UniProtKB/Swiss-Prot annotation:
One of its GO terms (molecular function) is ion channel inhibitor activity. Disulfide bonds join 51-65, 58-70. Pfam families: Toxin_12 (PF07740). Residues 20-50 form a propeptide. This is U7-theraphotoxin-Hhn1k. InterPro entries: Huwentoxin-1. Keywords: Disulfide bond, Ion channel impairing toxin, Knottin, Secreted, Signal, Toxin. GO terms for cellular component: extracellular region.
Length: 90
């Protein structure tokens, strides 16, 4: 009888330790995933901020994104930025 109780208590202790380990691992993975998401968001915000001038007024000497070019559109009397049919390399 004592052996059975000891075995049950020992098994519960092992399960508690394993559960704690899995929980710690899951928390570490969750933190890593959150950091990765924040990095991706920061990168996309930078890219969007750099290229916010689509269809905006421009001149040939103004800086622009690699895939946007300054074109004169008639009958509009100013130049606008349009896509140059290329894709940015990542």
């Amino acid at each position: 009888m004592k052996t059975a109780i000891f075995t049950v208590v020992l098994a519960l202790a092992v399960f508690a330790v394993l559960s704690f380990g899995w929980e710690a691992n899951e928390k570490a993975l969750s933190e890593e995933f959150t950091e990765l998401i924040h990095e991706k968001e920061a990168a996309s915000e930078t890219e969007a901020r750099e290229c916010r001038y689509f269809w905006g007024e421009c001149h040939d000497h103004m800086p622009c994104c690699d895939w946007l070019v300054c074109r004169y559109k008639w009958p509009i009397t100013y130049n606008i930025r349009v896509w140059n049919r290329t894709f940015p390399e990542k």
